[in-house]
Regions:
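ABC ATPase nucleotide-binding domain
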Residues: 11, 35, 71, 352-354
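The feature captures the beta-strand-to-loop junction immediately N-terminal to the Walker
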Residues: 45-47
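Helix-to-loop junction immediately C-terminal to a conserved catalytic motif
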Residues: 60
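Conserved coupling/switch loops of ABC nucleotide-binding domains, chiefly the family-specific signature
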Residues: 66-69, 225
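Conserved ABC transporter NBD signature motif
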Residues: 68-80
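ABC ATPase nucleotide-binding domains
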Residues: 92-94, 98, 102-245
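Non-catalytic connector elements of ABC transporters
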Residues: 253, 263-363
Length: 363
């Protein structure tokens, strides 16, 4: 056990947390266990109400669990059995709030220096540490400005600088990009990943955006109703989901109304509105009328007949900038439609939509 704690910057074991007490208690976390290794970024991903922000706040010391343990390095900061809980201000964690929570009447320098002053460091040391972290985040020339004089992206960097300035073992990020517009979000996502790699940070990040989680993190914990649904690398979560919930949350999919007509190992023979297709069974099993999905980008468009395909008329194409998203569907709505991507705008007509068996998942 001691070896695991040394390897891990953060260890959470069997954490339970309720809102309310007694008969009105609402379980939010239901036995969550996770770890964060040195230099690793873990994203807590999930829909609203899944428990991801509550887990982050429990680690920070801003929520009180009822059961389980939390350790930062070798130091226990919460133990439900011993009724021990270390106050948030003594956990030495860097926290970046969703709203950034900058003091409007303090300069950038003063905002970043605030935590160091609370720790009663000397003025010269504070000046050096703040100057160093501002330089690292590209804010060296903005030290005397106030928050209202900064862009959204610059405000975010100040919040990160404030969290990093006292060199915490773990930085906690609560929806760090959600307050930025689409263009700034893309730029900030790249900056945040570059900063994490360059400084070797250990970070736990909350997000509801799967693209953001995949781009920034080394590992994803997908939460569903207070439990970890699945965890793994971004690539494994996207390409080999264990459950329907994971498959649907991690990508853009087509759903097909299919009936199982036969099986051969993990290969499943399907009837989809008269078309005979082969798919791949995923998860613990599937019934006679399972949920069958395929990622939109895995659908191959052909003007001529191909194997494992459905023939449908083109209804419309939508221009997305780098590609077209095409919808194939009978105009009368008699069958479910399929979406597929194309580099070019397609001419009206009927097309064969090939659904590769290994990418047609049956749950």
């Amino acid at each position: 056990m001691k070896r695991d704690l040394i390897m891990n910057e953060l260890t959470v074991n069997d954490l339970h947390l309720d809102y309310g007490t007694g008969a009105t208690a609402n379980p939010i976390l239901k036995g969550v266990s996770m770890h964060l290794q040195k230099g690793e970024v873990v994203a807590l991903l999930g829909p609203s109400g899944s428990g991801k922000t509550t887990l982050l706040r429990a680690v920070a010391g801003l929520e009180s669990p009822k059961q389980g343990t939390i350790a930062i390095g070798e130091r226990q900061v919460f133990d439900g059995a011993r009724k021990f809980e270390l106050a948030a201000e003594h956990r030495n964690l860097g926290l970046v709030f969703q709203s950034y929570a900058l003091w409007p009447h303090k300069t950038v320098f003063e905002n970043v220096a605030y935590g160091l002053k609370l720790r009663k460091l000397g003025a010269a040391e504070i000046k050096d540490k703040v100057a160093d972290v501002l330089k690292n985040l590209g804010l060296g020339h903005l030290g005397e400005r106030y928050p209202h004089q900064l862009s959204g992206g610059q405000q975010q960097r100040v919040a990160i600088a404030r969290a990093l300035v006292y060199n915490p073992p773990v930085i906690l990020l609560d929806e760090p990009l959600s307050n930025l517009d689409a263009k700034l979000r893309e730029e900030a996502r790249a900056f945040l990943r570059e900063l994490i790699v360059r400084l070797g940070l250990s970070a736990l990040m909350v997000t509801h955006d799967q693209a953001e989680a995949m781009a920034i993190s080394d590992r994803i914990l997908l939460l569903n109703n207070g439990k970890i649904e699945q965890q793994g690398t971004p690539q494994s979560m996207y390409e080999t989901p264990d459950t329907l919930f994971t498959a649907e949350f991690m990508g853009s999919n087509n759903r097909l109304a299919a009936k199982v007509v036969g099986r051969d190992g993990d290969r499943v023979r399907l009837d989809v509105h008269g078309a005979q297709l082969t798919g791949t069974a995923r998860g613990p099993g599937s019934g006679a009328e399972p949920t069958t999905i395929i990622r939109v980008e895995e659908v191959k468009i052909s003007a001529t007949p191909v194997d494992n395909a459905i023939e449908l008329p083109l209804l419309t194409c939508m221009y997305l900038g780098d590609r077209f998203e095409c919808l194939f569907k009978h105009a009368d709505g008699s069958e479910a439609g399929l979406r597929a991507y194309s580099k070019y705008k397609l001419e009206p007509g009927r097309y064969w939509l090939q659904l590769p068996a290994e990418k047609l998942w049956v749950f």
